[in-house]
């Protein structure tokens, strides 16, 4: 059984393509017009142990908001599609990841109730073309469209780059663990996720 998805989202503002295989560790390629965002997406997908291609074109390059939001939407839909009925998945995971001064906790539930609660103290306003206000927005848009309940909390740290990168690493590791097949059951008292 291959759990994969190929999702394209095209609007008047952007064109986003995501090819994702969550069961096969392989090449990760990311191309967006935002260098630091590329770095974070590669980090996320690498720590998920996935094969992925993410391509993003900004048709109206006002700023980074549209690209960040539309990549989050498309990646979230790809994960939701790849997981299908979610039969057998572990469903829950949490990770606490250090990166030098930064320590970040991520806890998630693949619940089909997409929402995010993000508590990060990002002091720099921009890194490598990415407005840091769009980092929580990425996590919120991703969670909503993937159907994942997501909590991200900074436990310590002062370096904005380290805090953001620890968040993406922790999310990748948590997604890897929560999407693993552990049996043939639907992990819910309702019988459906």
Swiss-Prot record:
An annotated Gene Ontology molecular function: imidazoleglycerol-phosphate dehydratase activity
GO biological process: L-histidine biosynthetic process
Keywords: Amino-acid biosynthesis, Cytoplasm, Histidine biosynthesis, Lyase
Pfam family, one: IGPD
Annotated TM spans: none
InterPro entries for the chain: IGPD_sf, ImidazoleglycerolP_deHydtase, ImidazoleglycerP_deHydtase_CS, Ribosomal_Su5_D2-typ_SF
Pathway assigned in UniProt: Amino-acid biosynthesis; L-histidine biosynthesis; L-histidine from 5-phospho-alpha-D-ribose 1-diphosphate: step 6/9
Broad class of enzyme this protein falls into: lyase
GO cellular component term, pick one: cytoplasm
Entry's EC annotation: 4.2.1.19
Residue ranges of coiled coil: none
Subcellular localization(s) per the UniProt record: Cytoplasm
Reaction equations catalysed: D-erythro-1-(imidazol-4-yl)glycerol 3-phosphate = 3-(imidazol-4-yl)-2-oxopropyl phosphate + H2O
PANTHER family, sorted: IMIDAZOLEGLYCEROL-PHOSPHATE DEHYDRATASE, IMIDAZOLEGLYCEROL-PHOSPHATE DEHYDRATASE HIS7
Family listed: Belongs to the imidazoleglycerol-phosphate dehydratase family.
UniProt protein name: Imidazoleglycerol-phosphate dehydratase
